[in-house]
Regions:
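N-terminal alpha-helical transmembrane segments of multi-pass membrane transport
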Residues: 2-155, 173, 594-600
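Helix-loop-helix module between adjacent transmembrane segments
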Residues: 10-11, 29-32, 36, 44-52, ...
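Flexible loop linkers connecting adjacent transmembrane helices
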Residues: 19-27, 61-67, 95-112, 137-162, ...
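Membrane-water interface regions at transmembrane-helix termini and the short interhelical loops
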Residues: 25-30, 56-71, 92-109, 158-166, ...
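Transmembrane-helix boundary/entry motifs in multi-pass membrane transporters
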Residues: 26-36, 70-76, 104-122, 150-170, ...
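Membrane-lumen (extracellular) interface motif
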Residues: 53-74, 138, 236-260, 278-289, ...
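Membrane-embedded translocation segments of transport machinery
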Residues: 207-210, 214-517, 562-570
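Intracellular leaflet-associated regions of eukaryotic membrane-associated proteins
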Residues: 609-774
Length: 774
């Protein structure tokens, strides 16, 4: 197995045995990258881009179908992963908060203000504008909690609460996990700043081979998918804003509007390219501070132009609701009954067939989209957090990435979401007032997009009969200058809110467009920086700017392709890409939890971990080494020691083949070694027969399910029972040989690679177990 020898810089010695190729280019330091990792990203991303451009309708159909399948089968996985990560972060904060992302003597590279600005700009910037008003209104109109809350006041605060659920701790949990894991791996353990380093305690030396290449390569795909979602949202928002403020005259859902969005993407991509080439300390840091200052100014102005007392009350109330409901109750809500469709058990209300609560796909369109989006961004934002967190403690990082953004979300959504909901309620008030006066549209005016809005009067008294008795209503408007108010729910909601404040609408809108554009740039340039790190084995070397330009162009191309695919349904294409890309990465995040747990415990209890033994054959090795051999053209590594990765010997091949085809035979051999003697032969044979029956039953029932679908349940019962028995065997062998691991890893190994598990155990049993200490 070998590195790609073509073009390796003369005299270069790899610090870590990862593939590295170098291509000299005139007037530049050249291109240096991991060829396998880069190829994975390039092939998948440009393949997706070309597919979407060549066949927009077909690609949208495929993406939507993939999204539907992902959410249909894996809602539970997305939902349960997030609170697990949050509780794990709480554990680290309490018990290991003083451990540093770096050496004990190192100090933070960036000050608190610039540090928070860069984190926040990379993390959630653009989305705050796109969803700041529209999301609370969507949740309000859906009567999301119709079965439990009945007053309009409760609808309003719960709409804000649900929005905060999506943008609070759950949004930042994947970022913080990867940030802390990568920071400790890189700056304390001296490993490369890549995703593969986060799972080094799990894969060991095999991190530097094919498995690590696969993790980093797919991380590139997921990073670009997540960034493109934000780029698409930013393009939609910028074009909508400029169209409303100028005479562009773009018609909604037209080809001209889509073209304008694509132009916006490439303008910002060009700016992002200049930023990423200029480096972290100048371009990204400066723009991040500028973006957060501009958005803070906008939020401050709206807070004091609107009903300040109401918004401050809402902030306080939202805090209480958030910690009462979102930490546990809503955090584990999968909307199990709500996702049922009509004909499959959806609840009905009297004669209504629409059911209670939101529509069946609500969970897919909102919570699952968000969790997938945050997951897709986790390697990008997490590695970026790690890159700028050197010298900070775990506790400090959690302060800046959990407490800070959560507080900002409370302020932002209470201000803009509260203003939007109050305007929505005022529309209903004014319509009712006009109805009492004989004309529901008495106060109707034209909104900025031509839709119907309303101008609330300053003071009106209306007398109307109720049950035969005349009742007088007094309508007293304390804020007559806040007009017109609009009830439209969608992308336009943001601009409607900004344009209702006296005559300041255009000014506020331009400030918003400026902020969105800056966040747009910071998302793209930060993403390009991290993708380049992943493609270049974690090396952040000056002079190799051309490869960062390439990745910035790739992000722009994929975002363009998704917008071309979706057109009027651009958001659907963007959401689908994030959800599908985020699924396998959710599994990776669970593995990162294991890796981080071992990192902090090895640091806290080094003597305990020094006593553990390793498997003679790694689960990541064995026949999987053939993949590394093929990728390295069968050669020998010339610039690093990789003797642990070699062509499998005949024993390994035979044990794996036997386990793959005849697992009961392997189980019998294992049991005879674990429990030798004639007195144990019957029990050993019995277990082997049971394993064989489950294995054969799985295959037979799985094939038979083609004719009778219901048999699939029994097939999976057989397989998981089979895998669990093998996991117990692995657990016993680990205990006997004092090998590091846990039952979760054992079960996972049994499910995803039973043949590898059995071969691993048989080869391990060739050695004598360590003597017990008295």
């Amino acid at each position: 197995m070998a590195d790609a020898k073509v073009g390796i810089a003369e005299g270069e010695v790899a610090e870590f045995p990862m593939r590295s190729a170098y291509l000299p280019i005139p007037f530049n330091a050249g291109i240096k990258c991991n060829p396998v990792t880069s190829a994975i990203g390039i092939i998948i991303l440009w393949g997706l881009a070309i597919y979407c451009m060549v066949d927009p309708e077909g690609s949208l159909t495929s993406l939507t179908a993939a999204k539907a399948g992902t959410t249909y089968y894996f809602t539970w996985l997305y939902i349960v992963t997030t609170p697990i990560i949050i509780f794990f972060m709480a554990y680290l904060y309490i018990f290991h908060g003083n451990q540093k992302l770096g050496k004990d003597h190192e100090k933070p590279e960036f000050g608190a203000g610039s540090y928070f600005s860069m984190i926040f700009s990379a993390g959630v910037g653009i989305g705050l504008f796109f969803y700041g008003v529209s999301e609370p209104l969507w949740h309000l109109s859906d009567n999301r909690f119709d079965t439990g809350f009945h007053s309009q006041a409760e609808y309003g605060v719960h709409a804000i609460n649900l929005t905060l659920y999506h943008w609070g701790l759950g949004a930042w949990a994947p970022y913080v996990l990867v940030g802390i894991a990568a920071g400790i791996a890189s700056y304390r353990e001296n490993l490369p700043l890549t995703m593969r380093s986060c799972i080094y305690p799990v894969l060991g030396e095999y991190t530097w081979g094919f498995w690590g290449d696969l993790v980093d390569g797919f991380s590139i795909v997921v990073v670009v998918s997540g960034v493109c979602t934000s780029l698409g949202l930013g393009a939609i928002q910028i074009v909508d804003g400029v169209n409303l403020l100028t005479d562009l005259g773009l018609v909604a859902d037209s080809e001209e509007e889509n073209t304008a969005r694509i132009i916006a993407i490439w303008i910002v991509t060009g700016a992002a390219t200049l930023s990423v080439v200029s480096g972290l300390n100048f371009g990204i840091k400066f723009l991040s501070i500028l973006a957060i200052l501009a958005s803070f100014v906008l939020c401050f102005l709206v807070l004091f132009l609107d009903d300040t007392r109401f918004i401050l009350n809402l902030m306080v109330e939202a805090c209480g609701w958030y910690f009462q409901y979102n930490v546990v109750e809503v955090a584990f809500a999968t909307d199990a009954f709500g996702q049922l469709t009509r004909g499959n058990g959806r609840g009905i209300d009297g004669s209504s067939m629409s059911g209670l609560g939101a529509y069946a796909a609500w969970m897919n369109d909102w919570t699952i989209f968000y969790w997938a989006w945050w997951t897709a961004w986790s390697s990008f934002v997490g590695l970026f957090i790690a890159r700028i967190s050197r010298g900070r403690t775990i506790r400090e990082v959690i302060h800046f990435t959990f407490a800070g953004p959560l507080l900002y979300a409370f302020i932002w959504f209470s201000t803009f979401g509260g203003a939007g909901i109050r305007a929505y309620y005022r529309v209903r008030e004014v319509i009712q007032l006009g109805t009492l006066q004989g004309d529901a549209d008495m106060y109707a005016v034209s909104g900025i997009d031509g839709s119907t809005c309303y101008a609330p009067p300053a003071y009106v008294e209306v007398t109307a009969p109720v049950d035969g008795v005349n009742i007088t209503w007094t309508f007293e408007n304390e804020f007559p200058g806040i007009s017109p108010v609009c009830g439209t729910i969608g992308d336009i909601s943001w601009w409607n809110v900004l344009h209702m404040y006296y005559d300041y609408g255009p000014f506020l809108s331009w400030v918003a467009i400026f902020s969105i554009a800056i966040y747009f740039v910071t998302s793209s340039d930060s993403g390009s920086l991290i993708v380049d790190l992943l493609a270049n084995n974690g090396r952040d070397e000056p002079g190799f700017w051309i490869q960062r330009v390439f990745w910035a162009m790739t992000e722009g191309a994929v975002a363009t392709a998704l917008l071309m695919s979706g057109k009027s349904d651009a958001l659907k294409a963007l959401q689908a890409a994030s959800i599908v890309a985020g699924l396998p990465f959710t599994v990776l995040l669970c593995t990162v939890c294991i890796g981080l747990y071992r990192f902090v415990h090895q640091h806290a209890e080094p003597e305990k971990y020094e006593g553990y033994n390793q498997w003679k054959m790694s689960f990541a090795g064995g026949v999987y080494c053939y993949i590394d051999t093929i990728l390295s053209c069968g050669g020998v590594f010339s610039n690093a020691d990789r003797s642990y990765i070699h062509v499998p010997d005949m024993r390994t091949n035979w044990e794996t083949l036997r386990a793959l085809c005849l697992p009961p035979w392997s189980v019998l051999l294992i049991m005879n070694k674990l429990n030798p003697g004639r007195q144990n032969y019957v029990s050993n044979m019995t277990l082997a027969v049971v394993v064989g029956g489950l294995f054969a039953g799985w295959i037979f029932l799985f094939i038979s399910s083609v004719a009778k679908t219901s048999l699939l349940a029994f097939a999976w019962l057989c397989y998981f029972s089979f895998a669990f028995i093998l996991a117990i065997l692995r657990y016993e062998v680990r205990a006997k040989y004092n090998i590091i691991g846990n039952i979760g890893e054992d079960v996972g190994a049994g499910i995803i690679g039973y043949y590898q598990l059995l071969a691993q155990i048989l080869i391990q049993l060739d050695e004598e177990p360590p003597a017990l200490e008295l």
